[in-house]
Amino acid sequence: MKRVVIGFDTSCYTTSVAAVTVEGEVVASCRKLLPVKLGERGLRQSEGVWHHVRALPERLEELAPYIRDCEIAAVCVSARPRDEADSYMPVFHAGDAQGRGLAAMLGVPCFSTTHQRGHIAAAKVDSGIVDGDLLAVHLSGGTTELLSQVGEELTLLGGTLDLHAGQVVDRTGVAMGLPFPAGPHLEKLAVQGRSEG
């Protein structure tokens, strides 16, 4: 029987629930983009929380068939955006509350992490990096930063003080008439452009 960790991440624009084996194999990842009206450049935090609360049960129902024959060893939640002491966004409370509740019901540990650490961990998995210290360039909607990771310690080395890379992508996409967040839609256009040559 596979032992899995159930992960929750409720960021500004995506509700995510996943199951990963304790060895690091992704069993399933269930995500839903939050709806943003065409032409708009985001949601208020209260709207984001409302959408996450509605989407989380559906994501868990979607995940359930993949983990029926698994033992849930732990739960992990993105409780805030970054490792900074003042890092806070209400949207993260939806996944944090759901995850902590699930862990309590199952009698398993619940580990708290940050959305930023999740991005870095995903990049490590995708690139095949298992262990070791690294430099990470974190480009997202809310951050454009250079970080050093030594062991588990993240140190901010620098970043932008103005517009973040993700904001540029989203604003460009919205100006082109694409839905927000525009990253996935621009990526699809780029792939189509390459295939049409």
Model-derived features with residue positions:
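Conserved phosphate-binding catalytic cores of ATP/NTP-utilizing and phosphoryl-transfer enzymes
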Residues: 1-3, 108-135
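A short helix-loop
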Residues: 3, 7-11, 18, 27-29, ...
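Short glycine-rich, Thr/Ser-proximal phosphate-binding strand/loop in the N-terminal lobe
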Residues: 11-50, 155-156
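Acidic, glycine-rich active-site loops and adjacent beta-strand->loop/helix elements
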Residues: 14, 78-83, 114-120, 143
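Short, well-ordered amphipathic alpha-helical segments that serve as non-catalytic structural scaffolds
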Residues: 30-32, 51-66
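Short beta-strand-loop/turn "lid" adjacent to the catalytic site in phosphate-handling enzymes
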Residues: 64-100
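Alpha-helix C-terminal capping segments
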Residues: 97-109
